Amino acid sequence: MSAPTVWRRVFSAMVALLSTAAVFAADAPKTEEVPFWAIGMPKSDVASKLAPVPSFPIPTAADKLPVSKLKLPPGFKAEVWASGILDARGMRQGDQGTVFVSSLFVAGKIYAVQDKDGKRVVKTIADKLFLPNGIEFHKGSLFVATPKDITRYDNIEANLDNPPKPVMVYDKLPGDVPHGWKFIKIGPDGKLYVPIGAPCNLCLPPDTHAQIFRMNLDGTNVESVVKGMRNTVGFDFHPKTGELWFGDNQRDWLSEDMPIDELNHVTKTGQHFGFPFCHSGMMTDPEFGWGKDCKDYVKPALLLGAHAAPVGMRFYTGKMFPAKYENAIFLARHGPWNRTKKYAADVVAIFIDDKGNAKMEPFMTGLVEKNEYLGRPADVMVMKDGSLLVSDDHNGAIYRISYAGK
């Protein structure tokens, strides 16, 4: 065989090989960025059969709300307090009685709800915000936290029809969407407490994340208070001890029944609550738990249910409810979003004894029917009259729970 013939055959083979590669390249699926809610999701058939992400909430007409389905202990009554509040999430009451309501993905709004002649009037006081879940009210000012920053609206109740330009308080938040929306609260020390969740389902978070921080009300002197926190969307301070208690949402995609979400009790600054090494105080992580021992981290005060999704919580400081509820925690469980069996979507009452031991009882139930959510509680708030408001972002509504006796 002559040399030219050999080279012709080699050249032909190379052309064929490159053509085949081009075909495979053309047929190869394009790589798409994983949505934040699916980060860490296994690619197995079992995981793919889990429930899809719920559709975004839409407001439900007042006469269609599931208030008749709500079940409460004897003597308690539930009623619709406000409706038509798209994506209703966090709640805070102003000095003059205005209830401020935050929202998340769909609305991006802050609402002001006023009681006029027995009816609730809803106004939008801020719009087109980036996941403004975190709100707090203090001395006439409304603080609003997004994943990126914290702003303040001064003298807001006197200017609901013409809200003032927000004042920047702190603009150095990382801006992450995964676990980036906030729940904020001013502690008994007069400082603003702000969480920065883990920017992932499961990872070794940077030093700037997976913590609860506190700062002065002008955004200065930021310091870490809690470490090893994955994603808290609700916390409060004990009325007697002043100590911080917080809910923490544990990792997804390990199993339907593990890990179990936590209620944690902070007794000193700098405590580490386990993430990402230990979950639920008893389970080392299959990936990050090697060489770790759950005994080295603060154990949860209470386990709240697998993927129950604890969100807003408050210690009860009102006078309307029976004495057993004094200083109890009311905690909203949003319910699992990626579990085949729906449950929670309720409000639980948590009782704490003098030694810090906690036990949980059902309080407001009835929002799961035929494995579907009828509503999903997002926050709770004690009103000045002692009644309890419960926001429902699934229906865009707020319920009022009162007690009239047996």
Regions found by a protein language model. Give the residues of each.
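Short loop/turn segments immediately following the C-termini of beta-strands
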Residues: 104-105, 147-149, 155, 197-199, ...
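Beta-propeller domain segments
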Residues: 28-73, 181, 198-201, 215-220, ...
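Asp-box/WD-like beta-propeller blade repeats and closely related beta-sheet repeat scaffolds
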Residues: 122, 126, 131, 136-138, ...
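Surface loop/turn motifs at the tips and blade-to-blade linkers of beta-strand repeat domains
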Residues: 80-85, 124-128, 169-176, 224-228, ...
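A short loop-to-beta-strand structural motif that recurs across blades of beta-propeller domains
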Residues: 109-112, 149-151, 211-213, 262, ...
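Beta-rich catalytic cores
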Residues: 84-87, 106, 121, 128-131, ...
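Conserved beta-propeller blade signature
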Residues: 98-102, 141-144, 191-195, 243-247, ...
